[in-house]
Amino acid sequence: MADTTIKRNVALLKNKIGSLILKQIKGMIGEFIAELIANSFLRIDENTQKLTSCVNELEEADIWKRPNPHSNSVGNIILHLCGNFRQYAIASLGNSNDVRERDKEFSADGGYSKSELLKKLTDTLEEAKRIIQNTSGEELLRKRKVQGYTHSGIGIIIHVTEHYSYHTGQIIFWTKQLKDKDLGFYAGIDLNAKNEA
């Protein structure tokens, strides 16, 4: 009888400890996901500010200029960013139909003004961020096919963030080429400051 009681108490204690550990792990995972999303949104917002600044520097005619036949205009890149966010974040994470027509993003040679492109981008980003923010933990871990690749929801967040940064860099480079000026993104910031613990 005493052996059975001891075994039952040990099992209860293990279950209680296991539950506490599981609760801590779930809490840490929740914190990790919240931190990942917050930092992704920070990068997305930073890139939006830079991209908007570039578009505002350019003339309407500059928006559809291509550096060469093998490169895209700022207008094409913005349409491409909208398509990518729509396919990956809005359709995939939002569990809606994928209606992207990728080739049209690159074949366009006009049709949108600077302000229309920025509005289209801003609206797309706000919808994507809302969906990302409301995506469940299960959906963030679930694997799915997007554009022929297999991604988890977390992988999708990383992809749209880095993809946006990559193309924002192209827009910055092309704007500097066209305008021959420093865009002042880091004005007043000491980028030589050393790390602190």
Where are these predicted regions, by residue range?
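Short, contiguous alpha-helical
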Residues: 13, 18, 22-30, 41-45, ...
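Ala/Thr-enriched low-complexity intrinsically disordered regions
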Residues: 2-5, 11
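Active-site rim elements
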Residues: 34-41, 111-115
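Surface-exposed helix-capping loop/turn segments at secondary-structure junctions
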Residues: 57-64, 131-141, 178-182
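Acidic/histidine-rich alpha-helical segments that form the ligand environment
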Residues: 109-145, 154-166
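A generic alpha-helix structural signal
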Residues: 55, 78, 118-121
